[in-house]
């Protein structure tokens, strides 16, 4: 080859690389690089966690007694418990533990660790205690209700009648009842905090991966546990990177710098649909986008004001223009797709009707208030749209943006006026899962601190509705139970609740086609232990 032709060849190669950024980079074959927004990643303590982001990390550091099959949610699979039985009276669950499990510290798993972990959730009384308190567990009765006849057996006696299937679903799906290495955590406890401060940035699990490092709003790295009881994971390492800008995530996926990206703006997701190297996984979740009102605020304690706001939201417009890829129109507290879910009531923007309601409530000229929202999409755009239609009715809402702790923290403290948010659990395949999170409020006192219940956060309380929810949960006749759930939704609607469902969440995850056996979980408990990657000629091994 002469010099001219050689030069042309080099130039052509350079041009090819320049025009094909995906050829410039490839992640290592044995590592998974995940891009995500970590603004809501506030703690790694399973008892304190809130939000989908942390759940997806915690379930790969710890194990629970059981888990849900991501492709058939009603299928409960064994985990630390190799088998279990439910008593004839539906009031007792007995779990038999595996005998080959060790924690990352080398300590051997025993029933004492399971019991201590469950006691810890209740005694700390943080976010994840709410569900178990609603089932009747308390710091006073937990020692009698959860016992260990021997080192390999755990017996859970239900304090009050319940559907044992729901309890199993909760143990499997919530992530709150993962089992901690009690000896390791107790050694790190300070001032009777049950190790909470230490576990904020550390872990004490038996899961497929160990925590290497977490630098808040920067990077979190986990490495495989070669001695994991199910067998060593196929990936040596998983790296989660904090990338807040959607365009950055898109560019890095195009270049091959990331294997998986979540929290992307839908326009960027759509732009990647035709990339032959990428796949878009869309998973519908039970989580609901909503507008919440605080009934601690005199304005929103008035049902006529709450009803006025019901008609100052352009549900159809928001879902059509802002929620494509994020969610679908839904106006009921029970997630769609269940036999117990009523059709939507069909609420629409109706400014004249809203103005009349406000005038009747004593606010003919409206009033000033605040609207809290995460500084992320789609939340911010939804809040701006709602601010605009509220203004048409005379309600002047100042938008306050912030991080998850600033926004949801104020809601957990019941120190807010209006809030655009997302919640509703729905992770368990049972109508009670949605109702418990969005509607149920067994104790409206500030001291109750039922912070994982949106009903408590908003100050919405109705004793009859609580009783109806309790009764429906225990109904054994399937047809009657469905009718009970219909009646609950009708009463909830008539009460003009403090939380208005707008859209049901769809989670879009962009995945490089080199990634194999990655199955996004509707409950956010996505397991990474079996994930692997096809080799790439430009990818190296672990460094």
Language-model-detected regions and their locations in the chain:
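A structural "hinge/loop" feature
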Residues: 39-55, 77-80, 107, 129, ...
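N-terminal lobe/hinge region of extracytoplasmic solute-binding protein
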Residues: 35-88, 119, 202-208
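Ligand-site clamp/hinge motif
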Residues: 197, 225-271, 388, 396-398
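Surface-exposed binding/hinge segments that line
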Residues: 96, 134-187
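Aromatic- and charge-enriched surface segment that lines or borders ligand/interaction sites
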Residues: 82-128, 155-157, 165-166, 249-252, ...
């Amino acid at each position: 080859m002469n010099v001219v032709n050689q030069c042309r060849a080099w130039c052509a190669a350079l041009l090819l690389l320049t025009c094909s950024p995906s050829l410039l980079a490839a992640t290592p074959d044995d590592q998974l690089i995940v891009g995500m927004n970590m603004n809501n990643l506030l703690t790694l303590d399973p008892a304190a966690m809130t939000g989908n982001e942390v759940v997806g990390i915690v379930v790969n550091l710890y194990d629970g007694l059981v888990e849900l099959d991501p492709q058939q949610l009603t299928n409960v699979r064994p985990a630390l418990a190799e088998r279990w039985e439910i008593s004839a009276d539906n009031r007792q669950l007995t779990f038999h533990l595996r005998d080959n499990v060790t924690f990352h510290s080398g300590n051997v798993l025993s029933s004492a660790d399971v019991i201590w972990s469950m006691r810890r959730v209740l005694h700390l009384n943080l976010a994840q205690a709410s569900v178990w308190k609603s089932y009747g567990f308390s710091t006073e009765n937990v020692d009698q209700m959860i016992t260990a006849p021997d080192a390999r057996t755990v017996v859970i006696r239900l304090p009050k009648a319940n559907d044992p299937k729901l309890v199993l679903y909760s143990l499997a799906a919530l992530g709150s009842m993962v089992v901690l290495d009690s000896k390791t955590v107790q050694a790190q406890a300070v001032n009777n905090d049950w190790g909470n401060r230490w576990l904020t940035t550390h872990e004490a699990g038996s899961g497929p991966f160990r925590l290497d490092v977490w630098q808040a709003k920067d990077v979190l790295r986990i490495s495989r546990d070669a001695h994991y009881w199910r067998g060593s994971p196929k990936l040596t390492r998983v790296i989660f990177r904090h990338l807040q800008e959607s365009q950055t995530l898109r560019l890095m996926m195009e270049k091959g710098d990331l294997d998986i990206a979540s929290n992307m703006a839908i326009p960027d997701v759509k732009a990647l649909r035709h990339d032959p190297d990428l796949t878009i996984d869309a998973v519908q979740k039970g989580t609901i986008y909503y507008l919440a009102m605080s009934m601690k605020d005199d304005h929103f304690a008035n049902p006529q004001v709450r009803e006025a706001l019901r008609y100052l939201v352009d549900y159809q417009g928001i879902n059509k223009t802002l929620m494509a890829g994020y969610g679908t129109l839904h106006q009921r507290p029970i997630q769609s797709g269940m036999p117990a879910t009523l059709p939507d009531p069909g609420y629409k923007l109706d400014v004249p009707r809203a103005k009349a309601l406000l005038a009747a409530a004593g606010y003919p000229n409206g009033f000033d208030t605040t609207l809290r929202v995460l500084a992320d999409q789609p939340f911010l755009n939804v809040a701006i749209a709602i601010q605009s239609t509220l203004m048409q009715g005379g309600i002047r809402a100042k938008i306050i943006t912030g991080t998850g702790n600033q926004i949801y923290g104020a809601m957990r403290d019941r120190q807010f006026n209006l809030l655009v948010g997302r919640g509703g659990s729905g992770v368990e395949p049972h109508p009670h899962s949605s109702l418990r999170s969005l509607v149920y409020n067994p104790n409206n006192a500030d001291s109750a601190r039922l912070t994982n219940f949106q009903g408590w956060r908003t100050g919405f309380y109705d004793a009859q509705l609580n009783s109806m929810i309790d009764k429906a949960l225990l109904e054994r006749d399937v047809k009657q139970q469905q009718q009970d759930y219909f009646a609950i939704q009708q009463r909830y609607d008539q009460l003009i609740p403090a939380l208005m469902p707008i859209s049901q969440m769809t989670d879009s995850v962009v995945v490089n086609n080199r990634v194999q056996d990655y199955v996004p979980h509707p409950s956010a408990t996505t397991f990474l232990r079996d994930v692997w990657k096809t080799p790439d000629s430009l990818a190296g091994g672990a460094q």
